[in-house]
Amino acid sequence: MTSAPPPAKPLLYLDVDGVLNPVCPRPGSGYTRHRLLRSEVLLSSAHGGWLRELSEVYELAWASTWEAWANRCIAPLLGLPDLPWVACGGVNSGAPEGDFAPIMRHAAGRPFAWVDDLIPPRLLRRYADRSDVLLLPVEPGQGLRRRHVDRLLSRPPRAARVSSGPPGPRPSESAPSPRRPG
């Protein structure tokens, strides 16, 4: 007897700016300055360890205007392999609502978590009770913290149970059995 393959890990979509690269972090908060693509980027080595820990439960993916550049510039500094990425830098660049549609398309029905500093409150309300979607906002001045990692690890999104249709009749409600020919 063959067993079914294990279910795929939920996806974890990560923004860079405001999440891994906080806006104006406190001095001495463990961030190192890097000059990348003519911009100054602050990264914490703790994030690399946390993301590797999360990769045991999740399939990581970039959801950032950095797009493929995140693999070239950010991943090596955090000790991460190349990750899949979602195109979030198009026409709606800078509009968080515009980032959500490409994430939904990429997830293609798989459970996922999205960590971003600009998740619209309307989306937070809309998906608050879903077991297959976790939207985790991060304060852009602080970036990703251990409490966010703990939340992601404690209750990862899981596939929603799907009904195979309306329940069938109860045994007492079923049609009588036909008589055997006598």
Feature-to-residue mapping (PLM):
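N-terminal intrinsically disordered, low-complexity tails enriched in polar/charged
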Residues: 1-11, 171-180
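Alpha-helical substrate-recognition element adjacent to the catalytic core
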Residues: 2-94
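C-terminal cap/substrate-recognition subdomain and adjoining C-terminal extension
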Residues: 71-182
